[in-house]
UniProtKB/Swiss-Prot annotation:
Residues given in the record as S-adenosyl-L-methionine binding sites: H38, L40, G65, E86, D114, N129
Similarity-based family: Belongs to the class I-like SAM-binding methyltransferase superfamily. rRNA adenine N(6)-methyltransferase family.
GO molecular function terms noted in the UniProt entry: 18S rRNA (adenine(1779)-N(6)/adenine(1780)-N(6))-dimethyltransferase activity; RNA binding
Catalytic activity: adenosine(1779)/adenosine(1780) in 18S rRNA + 4 S-adenosyl-L-methionine = N(6)-dimethyladenosine(1779)/N(6)-dimethyladenosine(1780) in 18S rRNA + 4 S-adenosyl-L-homocysteine + 4 H(+)
Domain of life, source organism: Eukaryota
Listed Pfam families: RrnaAD
InterPro entries: KsgA/Erm (IPR001737), rRNA_Ade_Mease_Trfase_CS (IPR020596), rRNA_Ade_methylase_Trfase_N (IPR020598), rRNA_adenine_dimethylase (IPR011530), SAM-dependent_MTases_sf (IPR029063)
Record-level GO cellular component terms: nucleolus
Lineage of source species: Eukaryota, Fungi, Dikarya, Ascomycota, Saccharomycotina
EC assignment: 2.1.1.183
Protein name (record): Dimethyladenosine transferase
Function comment: Specifically dimethylates two adjacent adenosines in the loop of a conserved hairpin near the 3'-end of 18S rRNA in the 40S particle.
Organism: Kluyveromyces lactis (strain ATCC 8585 / CBS 2359 / DSM 70799 / NBRC 1267 / NRRL Y-1140 / WM37) (Yeast)
Matching SUPFAM superfamilies: S-adenosyl-L-methionine-dependent methyltransferases
Length: 320
């Protein structure tokens, strides 16, 4: 993973200058909505987001997509340091101008580059008016940090936020819901209307709090995610139906052979032959023993998926 270009800047400005700053920006360049550039212009909403993070004076805060700095200047007032990851050099330049020469000059560092390709330093808190097209990969990158943040306060498209919060049986419950809720506690903070942004997006937004579970569940992320990818292909089909796909069976057969090799086990057929039938039998065995064959993924909770994963591992079936 490549490192982003580092540029250190610092400083903050008063919220009273925000309107003039935004008007100036519209005459300088056009916001790129394809990059999710919708600047949060409501100072009350911005302050509310920062307050919900409960930043400590000793905290290092990661901000993703700072834009012109309406959140940044407020975070700088409370944190020891802010690391802001910005993709657009124009935005980084505007933020630099805004914070230049202020008392907190040495507290801001800008990393110029793609967040998903950026090697992140240590941070305690994450705050983001998230570019909506990277919402899902952003969440999983935060969850999979070696030392995840204590809390993340993130603005998302309303429907995406509701998927994060959805419970089994809800219409929006999906692989994203089950996956994130395995590793983190998610709560809804506030709704944010489209008119709070410049330019206004086409959809409403919501702010959520994500707190990574500590200690982390003793489950391999890739195994868990691999299982969910199979059962949620069509969440309203039975669990058993998800395992009948030829592609799924071929992947599980390959993984099963790899497992046997690590165990120095001797398969019932020669190594070059197909073990599909053996894998099918093991799948049927696990589904029968767990009693989940006819249940639908959209109705299953975390305990159900853990039963499945444990049962498959017991018979040598792996998903990553």
């Amino acid at each position: 993973m490549g490192k982003a270009v580092k540029k250190k800047y610092s400083g903050a400005s008063s919220g009273g200058k925000e309107v003039d700053a935004e008007k100036h920006l519209t005459t300088v360049f056009k916001f790129n909505t394809d990059l999710g550039q919708h600047i949060l212009k409501n100072p009350l909403v911005a302050q509310g987001i920062v307050d919900k993070a409960q930043i400590k004076p000793s905290d290092i805060v990661l901000e993703i997509g700072p834009g012109t700095g309406n959140l940044t200047v407020r975070i700088l007032e409370q944190a020891r340091k802010v690391v802001a990851v910005e993709f657009d050099p124009r935005m980084a330049a505007e933020l630099t101008k805004r914070v230049h020469g202020t008392p907190v000059e040495k507290k801001l560092e800008i990393l110029l580059g793609d967040f998903m390709k950026t090697e992140l330093p240590y941070f305690d808190v994450c705050i983001s008016n998230t570019p909506y097209q990277i919402s899902s990969p952003l969440v999983f990158k935060l969850i999979n940090q070696p030392k995840p943040p204590r809390v993340s306060i993130l603005m998302f498209q309303r429907e995406f936020a509701m998927r994060l919060l959805a419970r089994p049986g809800d219409s929006l419950y999906c692989r994203l819901s089950a996956n994130v809720q395995m590793w983190a506690n998610v709560t809804h903070i506030m709704k944010v209307g489209k008119n709070n942004f410049r330019p206004p997006p086409k959809v409403e937004s919501s702010v959520v709090r994500i707190e990574i579970k500590n200690p982390r569940p003793q489950v391999d992320f890739n195994e868990w995610d691999g299982l969910l990818r199979i059962v949620f292909v069509r969440k309203n089909r039975t669990i058993a139906a998800g395992f009948k796909s030829t592609t799924v069976l071929e992947i599980l057969e390959k993984n099963y052979k790899a497992f046997l090799a690590t165990q120095s086990a001797v398969p019932t057929t020669s190594s070059g032959d197909s073990l599909i039938n053996e894998v099918k039998e093991k799948i049927e065995q696990v589904l029968s023993e767990t009693g989940l064959a006819e249940k639908r993924a959209g109705k299953c909770d975390q305990t159900d998926f853990l039963k499945l994963l444990y049962g498959f591992h017991q018979v040598g079936i792996h998903f990553a």
